[in-house]
Structure formats: C-alpha cells, structure tokens
C-alpha cells in the first residue's frame, strides 16, 4: 500500500499543479492529462474538481476544441493543424527527416451509456437525428439493397419501460454529437497528415488501396465512428471502403477471445490493499448513490465503471445529471459526479499502470493487438510494407492497456475519441556527411508527445519503441490464458 508520506507527496503535487496552471495555461493543458493518481487522496480531495478536465458537450453539434488541448473526456484532443508541431530535432533542423508511416489507434466517439440506472432514468435520450444504417450488399453482382437504418422507438405498452429509459436510442449507440465529432476528427487528421505532411494518400484507393489499412472491432460504435472519421479524411471519396474486422469470438481487440486467466488476474488486482482502500474512502459516496438510484448491486458498487459511464454519457450529450425517479428532488450533484470521475481515473491508472500485475494483465487483454502494431512497425523498419497509414477504431479497454504498455506517466480514463499516433520517420543528422538514414519514432497521445516513465517519446529510435512494447506481447497467449 502507498505510504502516508507518498499520499502527502501526491497532495503537494496536486496543489503545485493547480497553482502552476493559474500562471501558465499552456503548461496546464498538458498537466490535465497527468494527475497524481497513485494515492487515494486524489479521489477524496474535492478541491481538485476535475483536475482541469472537461466533462460536457453540446447535444447536437460537434465539440469545440480548446486552444491548448486540455483533457476533454467527451471529445479528446487529436492532431490538428493549430496545435501540431514537428519533432524537436526536425523543427530545429538538426535532423533532416520525412514521415513515412502513421499507425493511428482511436477510441470511438461519444455515445449513449452502456449502463442504465437500475431505478430507471428521469430523462429520455433522443437519437432520431441519426440514422444507424443496417444493410448488406453483394460484393460484385446482385441487386442493390435498400439502405435501411435502425429507428429505435419506445412502445408505451411495454411494461419493462417503467424502470428503463424512454427515447429513441439504443444503449449504447453513437450520438449525432459523436458522429459530428468524428467527422471533424477526420478533417483535422487529413489537414495534418494528408495536406501538411503529405503522408495519407489523397484517395484511399491509391495504389489499389495498398497504402492504407482500416480496422475496427465488430461493434457498431467503432464502425459508425469510422464512417464519420473517414468521411472527414477523404471528403470527396464516394465509393465503399473495407473496414477490416476479425471474427468476434477471436478478436484481438475489445476482449474478443476467451481467456480465463484475465478474470483471475483482475480479481487479484481488485483484492489488494490499495484497491480496498479506494473502496473504503468512497464508501459514503457509493452508498448515497446506491440508495438514490436503487443501485446496491455488486456491478454498481464494486468499482466506478457504471456510475462514471452513466454520468459521462449524460453530460457528454447535453443532458443533466440524473435524479431519482421516486423522488426527483434527489439528484446527483456536480461534486458527487466529480468524485466519481476522479475515482474512475484512479481505477484506470491502477488497472494498467500502478498494480504489481499490470504487465501480465496487459499481456492477457491487449498483448495480441500490441503485437499487430509492432509487426506493422517492424515491416516498415525492414522495408517490406507498402502501408503508409493504418487506422484502428477500438475501445477505451484497448487504449488503456496500450498506454500502460507505453509506460504513460499517469493514466486518466481514455475519453471519447482518445487516440494514439505512432509516427515513424526516416532521417539523418544534418551534421553527418553521410547518406545513411535511420528510423525514428514519436508517439502522440491526444495530439501531443506522450509523457512516460521513459521520458517524453518525441524522438527515439524506432528500435527503442519496439523494445518498450515487446515485453507486453505474449509468446504463447493460449498457454498464458490457461495458466492460473
């Protein structure tokens, strides 16, 4: 367990960061990504608020980016022309380099909640301003389908609706705000990597489509996000695009394949003194919310996943925090929501960074997909790949372990549209009288060089980046999953 002294240091770090942010807004923007999360004092210190993070967005329009790209759970920052900068050695011209490959991994955009309050919802969710298309077509011959879409409705005669939620949405599903955020996300990527850096091809079918690789989970959330983002990247393209997916039962993202050891390791992680301490210091909050929303079950009380998800989805789509259906004067307060969000951040940092089993847990959950990323990087290094741009649409449960594998300094819950950009450059020292070029890498998290236990990954040999990730790729995942 972290000592009282460590907790005191975390408190001092928190106060110092808040004071620093008042005098240096540019520095404060990046500080919002790296709170002192290693002690539970971060959760209980109400003066921290959201640690500069944003938890609100308009209902039916795209989110507005902040000037300095602060942590925004509803629509995480991403590379865009206004804030993008070249790697320092390239910017100061000590190295002559060109970008040759981009591996881009992102979470889907904002959505409705997975978790509906057990006592029912006092506000309806509306999604009739979005069409969730549901159709197939023959690959080469055959009649063209009618492009049907799903239109959710609430039937007042359905008795189960009383303790559920009225409206025209599925739970979860992408919202119009999420779709528009995705479109802007793609426009910004195109402006940086297609127009400014001339890496992404002007059309996805260039060189018979061999320059790009598009991947997603089997979820409608990631597929719908891909449609919006890729329209932003290629606004003039008017043909279908393949979005590659593995079979859901063996998918290497979104915990697709069965692995009994995963739950065993997670159980061990959530049985530690540190984990129990965070439950102890939040007991009063959890009891209050459980009583208010009839949520006194293990799935709602054993961690903050469900309450965070419910509150985030409301605030990120223009709704209010929930009130009890039995007594609408009893509502979740802003202060309670902020503590829920801080606890959620603490949990994510603990799952993927701060517990003794983090390496094995990452191997079990995300090791195979990390292996896919590394194989892409190695193929570029070896000159055997035609790819210049790979884009994967995944989930927070994929982004978190990848950030953990990179050794991120502190891990807040990866918000909607959170993204990791692995940039690979070929370059040589300007001062050297040689034509030899080496491969270098930079890793951006939400548009800026990631801060890690290895330092800021803004310009390192590609081989060093591969070495950082390699320990998280299991040699034999089947045996590892069967081990106890």
Task: Describe each PLM feature range.
Residues 27-213, 217-390, 394-484:
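Signature for phosphate-centric chemistry
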Residues 1-30:
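Fungal secretory targeting signals
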């Amino acid at each position: 367990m972290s000592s009282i002294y460590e907790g005191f240091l975390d408190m001092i770090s928190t106060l110092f960061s808040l004071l620093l942010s008042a005098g240096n807004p540019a520095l404060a923007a990046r500080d919002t990504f790296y709170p002192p999360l290693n002690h539970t004092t971060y959760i209980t210190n109400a003066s921290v608020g959201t640690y500069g993070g944003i938890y609100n967005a308009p209902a039916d329009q795209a989110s507005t980016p902040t000037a300095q790209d602060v942590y925004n759970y509803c629509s995480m920052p991403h590379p865009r022309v206004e804030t993008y900068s070249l790697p320092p050695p390239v910017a100061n011209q000590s190295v002559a380099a060109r970008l040759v490959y981009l591996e881009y991994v992102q979470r889907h955009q904002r959505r409705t909640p997975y978790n509906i309050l057990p006592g029912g919802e006092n506000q309806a969710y509306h999604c009739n301003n979005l069409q969730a298309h549901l159709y197939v077509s023959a690959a080469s011959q055959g009649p063209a389908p009618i492009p049907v879409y799903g239109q959710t409705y609430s039937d007042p005669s359905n008795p189960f609706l009383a303790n559920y939620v009225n409206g025209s949405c599925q739970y979860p599903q992408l919202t119009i705000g999420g779709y528009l955020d995705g479109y802007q996300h793609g426009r910004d990527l195109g402006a940086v990597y297609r127009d400014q850096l001339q890496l992404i091809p002007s059309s996805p079918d260039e060189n018979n489509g061999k320059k790009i690789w598009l991947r997603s989970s089997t979820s409608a959330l990631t597929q719908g996000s891909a449609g919006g983002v890729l329209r932003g990247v290629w606004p003039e393209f008017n043909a279908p695009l393949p979005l590659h997916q593995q079979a859901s039962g063996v998918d290497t993202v979104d915990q697709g394949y069965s692995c009994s050891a995963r739950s065993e390791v997670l159980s061990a992680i959530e049985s530690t003194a540190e984990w129990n301490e965070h439950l102890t210091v939040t007991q009063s909050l959890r009891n209050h919310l459980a009583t208010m929303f009839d949520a006194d079950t293990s799935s709602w009380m054993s961690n903050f996943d469900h309450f965070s998800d419910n509150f985030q989805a409301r605030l990120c789509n223009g709704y209010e925090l929930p009130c009890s259906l039995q007594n609408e004067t009893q509502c979740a307060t802003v202060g309670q929501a902020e503590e829920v969000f801080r606890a959620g951040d603490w949990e994510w940092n603990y799952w993927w960074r701060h517990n003794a089993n983090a390496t094995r847990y990452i191997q079990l959950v995300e090791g195979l997909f990390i292996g896919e990323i590394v194989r892409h990087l190695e193929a570029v290094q070896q000159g055997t790949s035609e790819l210049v741009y790979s884009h994967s649409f995944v989930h927070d449960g994929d982004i978190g372990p990848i950030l953990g594998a990179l050794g991120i300094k502190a891990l807040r819950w990866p918000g909607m549209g959170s993204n990791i950009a692995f940039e690979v450059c070929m370059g040589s020292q300007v001062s050297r009288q040689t034509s030899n070029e080496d491969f270098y890498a930079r890793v951006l998290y939400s548009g800026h060089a990631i801060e890690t236990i290895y330092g800021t990954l803004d310009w390192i040999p590609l081989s060093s980046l591969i070495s950082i990730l390699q320990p998280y790729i299991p040699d034999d995942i089947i045996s590892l999953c069967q081990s106890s």
